[in-house]
Amino acid sequence: MVRFLIERPIAVLMTVLAAIVLGIYAYTTLPISLLPNLDIPEITVRINYPGMDARNLENTIIKPLRNQLLQVGGVVNIESSTSDGMSELVLSFSYSVSTKLAFIETNEKIDELMSIFPRGMERPMVIKVKPSDIPVFYLSITPTKDYYDAGKSFKELSDFSTSVIKRRLEQLSDISMVDISGLDHKQIEIIPNNEKLALLNLRYSDIITAIKRNNFNIGNLSFRDGYYTYRLKVLPIITTTSHIKNIKININNNQVSLGEIAEIKTTNHPGDGIFIYNGSRAISMAVYKHMDARIEKIGERIDVIIRDIQSANPNIIIEKERDQTQLLSFSMDNLKSTLAIGLFLAIIIVFLIMKNFRLSLIVSVSVPISLIIAFLGLKIAGISINIISLSGLIFSVGLMIDNSIIIIDNIKQHHGIQSDISTAILMGTNEVIRPLISSMLTTCAVFIPLISLSGLSGALFWDQAITISVSLVVSLLISIMVIPVLYKLLMDHNTSNITHSSHLLIIYERALETVLNHRKVFLLLFFLLIPLGVSLFFLVEKEQFPFIEQNEFNVKINWSEPVTLAENRYRVVAILKSTVSDEDAIYSANIGKSSFQLQKDSRQSINEATIHIELLQKRKKDSLSSGILNYTLTNYPGSKIEILPSKNIFQTIFKPNKESLSLRFRNNTYDVIDHQFIRYIDSLLLDSKLINKANHTSLNELYELEIEPERLLMYGISMDDIITRLKILFGILEVDKLQRSNSSYNISITEEQHNLFNKIQNSTISNIDGRTYPLRNFVRIRKVNRLKSIVCDQSGEFYEVPIDNMKTPDILQSKINNTPMATSGIGVDIVGSILERRVLFNEFLFVLIISLILLYLILAAQFESLLLPIIILLEIVFDITGALLFLYIFNSSLNVMSALGIIVMSGIII
């Protein structure tokens, strides 16, 4: 075959050129993303049932649903968190499970239970988590002072953002969705005059009935006239606030308009949450891309739209934040520059060793050709350009150069002996084909057990394994098919300047002679490396994934008090103004509940806030975070505050925030976790010094109102009337919706706000005869402590406490055994990332052993010897010890990425 190729150089070069063209085309069409497009093995089920308390929701809906979803194939774990009116179940699967099939099966299991759920409950929402669910970036839309001076309101900005900005962005083909939060909503409020209602013997139910009777929409009708059929549209009675005021109510054959007995007004309100940007109220937009979109192009197109909108609307400011395109650009540019520098240095070293420009040129040409054609292989294999596949290409560059040097050096040696260059090329190439194939197999052999790793590690390594394998196959083909042709073309009339690097050979021969003359000493030093390597393994810090430095972070605050939205905003702004200057950082905050559809922040309570801080100076991170922490705990000592990394794709997939060690407590006596159980557990933990301070942020202080049905029956008051009265008294009773062309407004009944006891003390309720009685005669109020949320897994309810002052689970278990928890009917489970890390490193050890066995078998087959492969494999001991030593010296950790590198290099060095 080699003779056939070197005799047809034009055909070979044209074939290579065609492959290069296809490779360039493949590169321009490959998706570019930070990480491989993994199916994250997690499905979230969200349940909304406003008005039902957490305990009833857990018992009647969530518990049966959790038991049903446990039957979904491949479920590894299921956890639920239930609070008043809402719940979220998270199903975790192994990476070998198809999340598409699991998603379908989850929906089927939910459909089977819908018949037993209460009527009127929305169908649970099933969400499949994907890397593309992370917003590419956020847009903050802030009105200037001139905007308000022009007489415009925040509601107008909300309408403009929804109808113009959001739509303009979603028109881009690369954008899949734009989520929005921080809007003002218009609402029509009806505030009845209770004195007039009592005088006219009217009840709230009369007002509700009148509104619903007049606010109808029966759609389009049709009628026939001869041969023609016409559509008939019935116009609604209510289209404006004035129409609501003119609604008539019959009273003893007399009519009274609603506007005469109630104040009707249109208001704008933010709901239960707002968004601020650099201290001013703003609107936040989360921009999501399509799965296959090239992320680096999205930012440029968005910038054009932002400039157009701002030029037409100078009174609003649109700013990008949490820009993932910058993270991608930085990561990709870093890897590409590393690849280019590595290739350049390798070629320089080849030239210094060979001291022949033409031979160096052959290597310089063959490696880029292999890289370009490798992109065609990635396109066929369905692999995107990401940091994992690019790191695989960087690995491959050295191997490509090795293959080229081996072929060239062997041909060169035969060329020095043979006068016929074709014979030299033929003999030199055929001699090394088998060793090159064997070398490729030993390198690829370590990939087979690595792919079998459980969890994220195995899934991530698939891209790297395919990339390196494709690159090695392409490099092998280029080495045995193209390099001989290039050698003949470039070296046919040039043999005089082919020299060897004598200095390196002299140094190598002297070193080898020294080792052979003192073989016992060097053997002793070699065997001493084994205990050194073991010691370094225990000394090197271990973590699941490497630390990723960021110039931004989040601050999550729970005030542990039932503060209002206004008070929540006041506290957040006070903290930020006291600790953050405009020169140090840019900040934004979601205060209370957010209205994002795809984010868990929407589960945030009204007394919580999440602050995002983007640093302008990296060195300020520690001082800034500690300043926020100290100020908050000093001024609001009961609050719970957490400093968390900013959420990006790495945080979503790697989940580094998981506690190292936590204790999960279960009540084996009653199977229910309540506030008394939590306080008892906290007291035991404090006594045993497992925690330094009890944190009761999992408890809510609230009031319970109990209706006395016997008294209602005695005085002729219906349960519906008192429930309606309470809804109006303690909140807003949504009666109906007023539909317009492209929007809808809630029609609600409310009252002037007073404190709890004044409301109960001064309010009245009428019976069916029109007699009025004090509301306090029919209800009882008491103050209680309840769980903020009920947390469960497949074993039932639990209370989880992070343990920060314990290094290993073994020490923690011995501490638990010496406390009353061991014998008091309390179930205790130890969970955390440390345990997961143990499992992972045990798997890595197993993979390393399997890889060594495979390497031994391949080498034994190649050398037809059982002893020689053992001698060769002893080199790995020295290499692993050296790798651990450098990790220790440079204060790095042994993690998934470094462990993968060690195992892959074990195959490469052989």
Residue ranges and their predicted role:
Residues 23-28, 345-352, 357-412, 857-910:
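Hydrophobic transmembrane alpha-helices and their membrane-interface caps
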Residues 321, 332, 408, 414-438, ...:
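Helix-loop junctions and hydrophobic alpha-helical segments within the transmembrane domains
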Residues 79-84, 129, 158-288, 674-802:
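Beta-strand-rich non-transmembrane domains
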Residues 181-183, 191, 260-262, 276-348, ...:
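Juxtamembrane "pre-transmembrane" interface segments
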Residues 1-32, 432, 485, 498-546:
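Signature of alpha-helical transmembrane segments and their immediate interfacial
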Residues 397-411, 433-452, 459-499, 611, ...:
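Transmembrane alpha-helices and their membrane-interface boundaries in multi-pass membrane transporters
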